[in-house]
């Protein structure tokens, strides 16, 4: 069922200050803790131990890129944001740039210099 979505013609989109931020999808293998509080069945633990760790997909505004991790925010405003998601580089399977741009850290530094 691959139907094309027809969109109405729209006027030119206005630009916003945070349009300069890079947006990225990160596919990564997460760590996992399996079991409940208290004692757990050893057979269930052995069965779960053989299963691969879950593959996760995160999309967000790139806040910072370091040698050790990528930091993303899913939502950002002028002075508030969602929770920060830090993904260790060793867990990352794929990075896809959805919108090229700068990190929030670089963006804020540039704004300070321009003032």
Per-segment meaning from a language model:
Residues 2-115:
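Conserved RNA-binding domains used in RNP assembly and mRNA/RNA metabolism
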């Amino acid at each position: 069922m691959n139907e094309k979505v027809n969109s109405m013609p729209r006027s030119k989109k206005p630009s916003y200050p945070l349009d300069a931020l890079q947006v990225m999808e990160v596919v990564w293998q997460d760590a996992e803790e399996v079991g409940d509080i208290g004692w757990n069945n050893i057979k269930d633990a052995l069965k779960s131990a053989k299963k691969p760790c879950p593959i996760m997909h995160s999309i967000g505004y790139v806040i910072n890129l370091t040698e050790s991790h990528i930091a993303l925010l899913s939502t950002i405003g002028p002075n508030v944001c969602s929770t920060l998601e830090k993904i260790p580089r060793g867990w990352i399977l794929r990075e896809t740039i959805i919108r090229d741009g700068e990190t929030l850290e670089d963006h804020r530094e540039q704004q300070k210099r321009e003032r």
